[in-house]
Amino acid sequence: MAKVLYITAHPHDETVSYSMATAKAFIESYKEANPSDEVVHIDLYKENIPHIDADVFAGWGKLQSGAGFDTLSAEEQAKVARLNELSDQFVSADKYVFVSPLWNFSFPPVLKAYIDSVAVAGKTFKYTEQGPVGLLTDKKALHIQARGGYYTEGPAAELEAGHRYLGTIASFFGIPSFEGLIVEGHNAEPAKAEQIKADAIERAKALGKTF
């Protein structure tokens, strides 16, 4: 049985969002094809995702100096403990499904905060004399992203930073398989929007059977 983290970074649901509608079709297809797998939904707009702030750095610093966890302030304890929960949960999974829109050439900031929470030396990567090495070498990841315009080809391709960044992070973590399910052009060509959405949903259903 595999454990899948279904990580959504969108304030809207599938009735409004193309990425969420595509993701819903994918995850339903996946569950049907893999009924014994555990799928854990992490809605980043509803979860407590601490930012790496002064409290976190202070707490980490105290722990690294040998101080006990009980010496941390209440704020430091809460944030450090939550970050540990998130990173442990991430490492425990076998597959990751990230869902986001393309906003300002990237993704919503809550997804960056989540990535920061799981990018932990000794858990998702380690330092060696040759440089950092990823530790998640037996995992796989998928990014479902909707883009109102066209960014796969042409001059705008260099502007898209969200999907490319997630690919970089996956590689940094050692994840050998990173796929993209991209939905694009529905704002650029409104007359084709419903067909674009329908095509994406069909692709999602097919991928859900094999992911």
Swiss-Prot record:
Pfam family, one: Flavodoxin_2
The organism's place on the tree of life at top rank: Bacteria
Enzyme class: oxidoreductase
EC number per UniProt: 1.6.5.-, 1.7.1.17
Keywords (A to Z) from UniProt: Flavoprotein, FMN, NAD, Oxidoreductase
GO molecular function: electron transfer activity; FMN binding; oxidoreductase activity, acting on NAD(P)H as acceptor; oxidoreductase activity, acting on NAD(P)H, quinone or similar compound as acceptor
Cited SUPFAM superfamilies: Flavoproteins (SSF52218)
Binding site residues for FMN: S17, Y18, S19
Presence of the UniProt keyword Chaperone in the record: no
Cofactor: how bound: Binds 1 FMN per subunit.
Cofactor(s) this protein requires: FMN
Oligomeric and partner information: Homodimer.
Known role: Quinone reductase that provides resistance to thiol-specific stress caused by electrophilic quinones. Also exhibits azoreductase activity. Catalyzes the reductive cleavage of the azo bond in aromatic azo compounds to the corresponding amines.
Protein family (similarity comment): Belongs to the azoreductase type 1 family.
Protein name: FMN-dependent NADH:quinone oxidoreductase
Organism, as annotated: Bacillus pumilus (strain SAFR-032)
